[in-house]
Amino acid sequence: MSRALLKFVRVSPTKARLIAREVQGMNAELALASLEFMPNKAAGIISKVIASAVANGDFEPEEVEITSCRVDKAAVMKRWRPRARGTASRIIKPTAHILVEVGPAKKDGEDA
């Protein structure tokens, strides 16, 4: 089993979790192929983290499956935007930590 962790990436954790749930449990090669055609910003980021996790374990993408793909909330950058009558509105720029773990793929008929 190998893992890759990307910290403080500038993407909303809630939006990235939608993509992470789609690829969890998939074969790594199939996940990378499907993420390539998703229009989301998070899809490209998660794709790179999956490729890094596969490379960290010296595996080939077709030999492994994604055992865990987790997106956690990180620090939030706060900015201010001037508004009418001297007031200000807060701009929230969320960041996320993305953790991907890959392990050997189970063969058909093989139990845990």
Curated annotation (Swiss-Prot):
On whether Electron transport is a keyword of this UniProt record, the answer is no
Give GO cellular component annotations, separated by semicolons.
cytosolic large ribosomal subunit
Q: Does the keyword Ribonucleoprotein apply?
A: yes
Which keywords has UniProt assigned to this entry?
Ribonucleoprotein, Ribosomal protein, RNA-binding, rRNA-binding
Q: Which domain of life is it from?
A: Bacteria
- HAMAP family linked: Ribosomal_uL22_B
Name recorded for this polypeptide? Large ribosomal subunit protein uL22
Q: What is the protein's species of origin?
A: Sulfurovum sp. (strain NBC37-1)
The gene it comes from is rplV
